[in-house]
Amino acid sequence: MTMTDPIADMLTRLRNANSAYHDSVVMPHSKIKSHIAEILQQEGFITGWKVEDAEVGKNLVLELKFGPNRERSIAGIKRISKPGLRVYAKSTNLPKVLGGLGVAIISTSHGLLTGQQAGKKGVGGEVLAYVW
């Protein structure tokens, strides 16, 4: 059965694993999910990620990050642009998540970027998700 929104599925798996204090989470692999994982690692929300071969296709494995007393590094994740309601932002009107404490993941013509990176490059795009 095909998935309607694979990005929402990825974010939900990540949110659930984070809430249950799992060390890692496994999901089906795609290029856009790998790029989102790369942004999450650069911003310090996860410790790492890798692609593993599965019986059918490939799996993406995200290693979750916790503080010294098992504090979660991800407080929240929200999918913004959905298949039924796309949300776009101009370069002059890019969103700030929690006043700059969180990260907006934006799909631009330069690839997936954070809100800050898109602002520096002067490009807008589709707002995929907020992570804080």
Swiss-Prot record:
Q: Which InterPro entries match?
A: Ribosomal_uS8, Ribosomal_uS8_sf
Does the record carry Acetylation as a key word?
A: no
Which molecular-function annotation in GO is an example for this chain? Answer: structural constituent of ribosome
Pfam family of this protein, just one? Ribosomal_S8
Coiled coil regions in record: none
Decide whether keyword Ribosomal protein is in the record: yes
| SUPFAM superfamilies linked to this entry | Ribosomal protein S8
Q: State the UniProt keywords alphabetically.
A: Ribonucleoprotein, Ribosomal protein, RNA-binding, rRNA-binding
A GO BP entry: translation
* GO cellular component terms listed in the entry, alphabetical order: ribonucleoprotein complex; ribosome
Look up the domain of life of the source. Answer: Bacteria
The subunit field of the Swiss-Prot or TrEMBL record says: Part of the 30S ribosomal subunit. Contacts proteins S5 and S12.
Q: Which family does it belong to?
A: Belongs to the universal ribosomal protein uS8 family.
Biological role: One of the primary rRNA binding proteins, it binds directly to 16S rRNA central domain where it helps coordinate assembly of the platform of the 30S subunit.
Official protein name in the record: Small ribosomal subunit protein uS8
